[in-house]
């Protein structure tokens, strides 16, 4: 027994190493595409449909992009399919058309001309086939229990066509042999279809048809109709650095970015609204009181008038007293720029740093009406730059040579009307945003210059 003890310790150690290696594979997501990693991924899964493999896969990619390139921990096979870029688009499979003889269809019209396709992958599910077993028809392929693992050949065919045409171009044809030794492979398989997607975009045929057929050794062929496949396209968008790119891509497909006025019907126009009463003090530079003396009729705004009462008719003396009280009340509602108010404002300004500096600003997408289609993040720290760049400017403000000369000329006063240099962002960082496009497909984009890191005088 003592002689077997070292071998027992060695066997336990090997088992422990194997378990650690298996756990590392699970963390990398090699055994299941839909498994998320990290607390951030689990927090965002609540915003995605349950069992949605496409969204779960995109959420994992978002978590890797946000963490600053988690691809170094991935296997070589995934690193080859994840080239550097700023855009990842997912395309869900739609049910095919019998007339077009396609099991599934992909609508790739969301791809823009500014997006240079770097890579594209087709993901399809074979879990039920890999996990199934059947009575072995030939003893040569049987195990000791009389069962055999499935051995078959996959035929993947991709067509490209317009929405109103039959399949016109067979852009890809794949033949994949699945042997018994591949049973323990991932349930979701993927295939590189970069050239196929590029050809479809080149032909101007942004609709792909996809067929998946399986053939067993006895030459029996069946069509696979299980979990729907999906396509991931990795691209580099050259227009993402252009002005207002975040508005055109994030907000453009939905509704125009503008204040939505209240659409009044004829009946609503005749009804008095409190919201219009609240706007008057803003126009007249008056402080809103507990009660409003404004009213709206069908013709528009009426002039200010005293409150109505149910008392008897007053004499002239009472009317004069009432006018005095009314005047004092009106005077108290008007903004007074007296010495006390100005001192309070100056004291508030003195408490804030006057020189150019980075100030805190948190942007919540719900406040600007974008939370409906932005999956993550719900908010982010944007910051902003504010403050004076007066002469002499300290080195901490990192003024440019031009800003230094401009501040000197302004201080000397030789040339009138020269403004002081501006406090602007010096360094900015990017932000990864996961959102839904106009076709309800999940898109990941990395937008540059979204968060201010430091400020300077320019």
UniProtKB/Swiss-Prot annotation:
Which molecular-function annotation in GO is an example for this chain?
cytokine activity
Q: Mind telling me which SMART domains this protein's record contains? A: TGFB (SM00204)
Q: Which domain of life is it from?
A: Eukaryota
Where does it localize?
Secreted
Give the region (Disordered) as residue ranges. 244-275, 303-335
Q: Where is the signal peptide?
A: 1-23
Residue ranges annotated as propeptide are 24-348
What keywords appear on the UniProt entry?
Cleavage on pair of basic residues, Cytokine, Developmental protein, Differentiation, Disulfide bond, Glycoprotein, Growth factor, Morphogen, Secreted, Signal
User: Using the chain's own numbering, where are the disulfide bonds?
Assistant: 356-423, 385-455, 389-457
| Entry GO CC | extracellular space
Positions of glycan attachment: 107, 449
Q: Which Pfam families match?
A: TGF_beta (PF00019), TGFb_propeptide (PF00688)
Asked if the keyword Secreted belongs to this entry, the reply reads yes
Subunit: Homodimer. Can form heterodimers with ADMP, BMP-2-I and/or BMP-2-II, and DERRIERE.
Please describe what this protein does.
Dorsalizing factor. Antagonizes mesoderm formation by ventralizing BMPs.
By what name is this protein known?
A: Bone morphogenetic protein 3
Originating organism: Xenopus laevis (African clawed frog)
- Identify the taxonomic lineage of the organism of origin: Eukaryota, Metazoa, Chordata, Craniata, Vertebrata
Gene name, per UniProt, is bmp3
């Amino acid at each position: 027994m003592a002689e077997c003890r070292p071998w027992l310790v060695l066997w336990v150690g090997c088992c422990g190493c194997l378990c650690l290696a298996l756990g590392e594979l699970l963390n990398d997501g090699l055994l299941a595409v839909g498994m998320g990693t990290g607390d951030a991924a689990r927090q965002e899964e609540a915003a995605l449909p349950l069992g949605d493999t496409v969204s779960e896969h995109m959420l994992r990619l978002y978590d890797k992009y946000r963490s600053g390139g988690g691809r170094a921990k991935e296997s070589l096979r995934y690193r080859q399919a994840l080239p550097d870029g700023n855009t990842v688009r997912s395309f869900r499979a739609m049910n095919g058309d019998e007339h077009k003889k396609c099991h599934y269809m992909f609508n790739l019209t969301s791809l823009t001309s500014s997006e240079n396709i770097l890579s594209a992958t087709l993901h399809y599910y074979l879990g039920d086939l890999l996990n199934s077993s059947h009575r072995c028809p030939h003893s040569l392929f049987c195990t000791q229990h009389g069962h055999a693992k499935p051995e078959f050949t996959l035929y993947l065919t991709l067509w490209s066509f317009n929405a109103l045409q039959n399949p016109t171009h067979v852009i890809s044809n794949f033949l994949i042999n699945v042997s018994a030794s591949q049973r323990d492979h991932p349930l979701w398989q993927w295939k590189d279809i970069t050239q196929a997607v590029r050809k479809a975009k080149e032909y101007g045929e942004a609709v792909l048809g996809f067929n998946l057929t399986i053939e067993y050794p006895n030459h029996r062929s069946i069509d696979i109709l299980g979990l729907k496949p999906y396509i991931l396209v990795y691209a580099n968008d050259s227009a993402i650095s252009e002005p207002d790119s975040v508005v055109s891509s994030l907000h453009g497909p939905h509704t125009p970015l503008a204040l939505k006025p209240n659409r009044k019907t004829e009946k609503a126009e005749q009804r008095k609204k409190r919201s219009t009463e609240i706007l008057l003090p803003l126009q007249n530079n008056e402080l809103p009181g507990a009660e409003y003396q404004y009213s709206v009729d069908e013709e528009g705004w009426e002039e200010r008038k005293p409150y109505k009462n149910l008392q008897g008719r007053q004499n002239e003396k009472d009317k004069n007293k009432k006018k005095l009280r009314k005047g004092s009340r009106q005077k108290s509602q008007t903004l007074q720029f007296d010495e006390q108010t100005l001192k309070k404002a100056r004291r508030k300004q003195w408490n804030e740093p006057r020189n150019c500096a980075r100030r805190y600003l948190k942007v919540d997408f719900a406040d600007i009406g974008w939370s409906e289609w932005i999956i993550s993040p719900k908010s982010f720290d944007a910051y902003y730059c504010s403050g004076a760049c007066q002469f002499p400017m300290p080195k901490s403000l990192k003024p440019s040579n031009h800003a230094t000369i401009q501040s000197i000329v302004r201080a000397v006063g030789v040339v009138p009307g020269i403004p002081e240099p501006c406090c602007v962002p010096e360094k900015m960082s990017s932000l990864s945003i996961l959102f839904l496009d106009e076709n309800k497909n999940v898109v990941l984009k990395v937008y540059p210059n979204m968060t201010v890191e430091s400020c300077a005088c320019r």
